Amino acid sequence: MTAYKSGDPTTINRLYGRAKGKPLRQGQQALVDELLPQISMPAEGPITAEALFGEPRPLHFEIGFGGGEHMAFRADMLPDHGFIGAEPFLNGVAQALTHVSGDNGQHPPIPNVRIHHGDALEVLRRIPDGSLSFLYLLHPDPWPKARHAKRRMMNDGPVDLFAAKLRPGGEFRFGTDHAVYLRHALMVMRRHKHQFEWLAKDARDFQVRPGGWPETRYEHKARTVYGHEVWYFRFRRR
């Protein structure tokens, strides 16, 4: 039984955001039609490493993987681990498939990735408690208006769910370039200090990107085009 509270006003019961943008290019559509069904999550049943990859292995989950650069990089770096990602935006899924496919067939496909085109919360609810080694939430939609604050993924209900699904010693990584969301997220995590230990020892630990944490296209644009500062947070499940 998880600590996830479906009636909590700080709990979102579905992910908000757009589902599709500009039309897909021909190659992207081909990947959606051909590759996505091969590496999609099963429609029913518990989501475990054994069910997805045929053997026990450390399991990583990325919520809203954007263009998939981070997920593909980490999966390629850790071939003995299993990576799952959820993204409701079809164009992001298509971009991720380009990375996973080995840049449209120029390299061998990355075999240890599974994708869900849809709501990350649906996936989390099907993962047995204590199963995840890593959970990533990188640059989620900040929903800056106060009346939309309950739509933020960083709220008490979802964070309780994160804690339930991570194993003891597992790691939750959060990144943002939005100052309002930064303050909101830290307030939320402070309320969950009994579940998570913040791994920062000094300011550099959250102002400098850690090793093995690649810069995504979104992050690069935030820094270079908009001049945003980016913050990186690592929390260990107690």
UniProtKB/Swiss-Prot annotation:
Matches recorded under SUPFAM superfamilies: S-adenosyl-L-methionine-dependent methyltransferases
Active site: 141
InterPro entries according to UniProt: SAM-dependent_MTases_sf, tRNA_(Gua-N-7)_MeTrfase_Trmb, tRNA_methyltr_TrmB_bact
Coiled coil: none
Catalytic activity of the protein: guanosine(46) in tRNA + S-adenosyl-L-methionine = N(7)-methylguanosine(46) in tRNA + S-adenosyl-L-homocysteine
Binding site for substrate: 145, 177, 216-219
Keyword terms, alphabetized: Methyltransferase, S-adenosyl-L-methionine, Transferase, tRNA processing
Pathway: tRNA modification; N(7)-methylguanine-tRNA biosynthesis
Entry annotated with the keyword tRNA processing: yes
Positions annotated to bind S-adenosyl-L-methionine: 62, 87, 119, 141
Enzyme Commission numbers on file: 2.1.1.33
Pfam families in UniProt: Methyltransf_4
Molecular function per GO: tRNA (guanine(46)-N7)-methyltransferase activity
Top-level EC class as recorded in UniProt: transferase
Any one annotated GO CC term: tRNA methyltransferase complex
Protein purpose: Catalyzes the formation of N(7)-methylguanine at position 46 (m7G46) in tRNA.
Protein family according to the UniProt entry: Belongs to the class I-like SAM-binding methyltransferase superfamily. TrmB family.
Name recorded for this polypeptide: tRNA (guanine-N(7)-)-methyltransferase
Taxonomic path: Bacteria, Pseudomonadati, Pseudomonadota, Alphaproteobacteria, Sphingomonadales
